[in-house]
Regions:
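Short, polar/acidic, helix-capping and beta-turn segments at strand->helix junctions
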Residues: 2-129
């Protein structure tokens, strides 16, 4: 009923969870785990603050979706977690680069007390086809 999706093109899980789960018997749906802006090759955050971390987080999601045969155009819902809600506009600017006009997924965004590894932003996505 479901398949674990894993790719070395996104960071390995930092806890007991999968990068993503694809549900294919009901329909073709993928649920990614929250992606910090970690560079897969190093496990470190890129230089450049919240913008660089947001970009890397979305690149990680893109890589996971690709492993499942999907693209960012398949994303129907995202959740954005921010260490500081004052970074909302900065993250929005990067986020908009990843989605075609008119194909913006539903989204929720929240400030949280802290993110793993001291991250500034974490994004999760649901994709469907």
């Amino acid at each position: 009923m479901s398949n674990v999706i894993a790719t070395p093109k996104a960071p390995a899980a930092v806890g007991p969870y999968s990068q993503a789960i694809q549900v294919s018997e009901v329909s073709d749906i993928i649920f990614t785990s929250g992606q910090l802006g970690l560079v897969p090759e190093t496990g470190d955050f890129p230089e450049g603050g919240v913008e660089a971390q947001a970009r890397q987080s979305l690149e990680n999601i893109k890589a996971i979706l690709s492993q499942a045969g999907m693209t960012m155009a398949n994303v129907v819902k995202t959740t954005v977690l921010l260490a500081d809600i004052a970074d909302f506009a900065k993250v929005n600017a990067i986020y908009a680069e990843f989605f075609a006009d008119g194909a913006l997924p539903a989204r929720s965004a929240f400030q949280v007390a802290a993110l793993p590894k001291g991250g500034l932003v974490e994004i999760e996505a649901i994709g469907a086809r």
